[in-house]
Amino acid sequence: MLTRKQQELLLFIHERMKESGVPPSFDEMKDALDLASKSGIHRLITALEERGFIRRLPNRARALEVIKLPEAYAGASQVRRGFSPSVIEGSLGKPAAPPPAPKPAPPAEAASVAVPVMGRIAAGVPISAIQNNMHDISVPVEMIGSGEHYALEIKGDSMIEAGILDGDTVIIRNGSTASPGDIVVALIDDEEATLKRFRRKGASIALEAANPAYETRIFGPDRVKIQGRLVGLIRRYH
């Protein structure tokens, strides 16, 4: 199952090649999907390649081959009956590409999207940085809105007064900026990740718990990197 952004990118690439025969650049793909940086496009392409939807062609700049399309796509029947892969060539030395085609919408019937669960994060004492995709969860579309998202399982009780409990799953919108008061995933010294409320104390950054048993921690701005902000929460009752 593809995430919404993975599906949008795959269909954008396919439709663009069908309509104009001109490959979209990474900047055009980034703009079409409303992502903040091209690194997000690289991650989406890698995920599509791992799932067998596209293939990168060696020794050719930005050349991709579309192998198949999602079953829910309107043209899925054509894919199953002799679909001819679209090859995207690099544009080095070629005339500039025209503006990107309109971003394809996900299937109207889709009520939820798959969001990768990247691991466990501390709502308490920071634990090792989270980097592994454990599995995917289904999240209602209206919960997350636009942007790139991932999920984390909560360990600890430092955010209980914000309604975040041990064992909850939080939905995070990927990004490197935050406003004071946002609940964020903060990476400390490139080693430890924690979920806290973001504050500024002069030139420093304060990571504030929502539990009086935990002290607010103050760091220099060069020691903290914002990895995303909280946009939703899922709780299972046993």
Swiss-Prot record:
GO molecular function: DNA binding; serine-type endopeptidase activity
Record CDD domains: S24_LexA-like
Catalytic activity: Hydrolysis of Ala-|-Gly bond in repressor LexA
Organism: Rhizobium meliloti (strain 1021)
This protein's name: LexA repressor
GN (gene name): lexA
EC number: 3.4.21.88
Positions marked as site (Cleavage): 123-124
Segments of the chain annotated as binding DNA: 26-46
Active-site positions on this chain: 158, 196
Record-stated family: Belongs to the peptidase S24 family.
Highest taxon, organism lineage: Bacteria
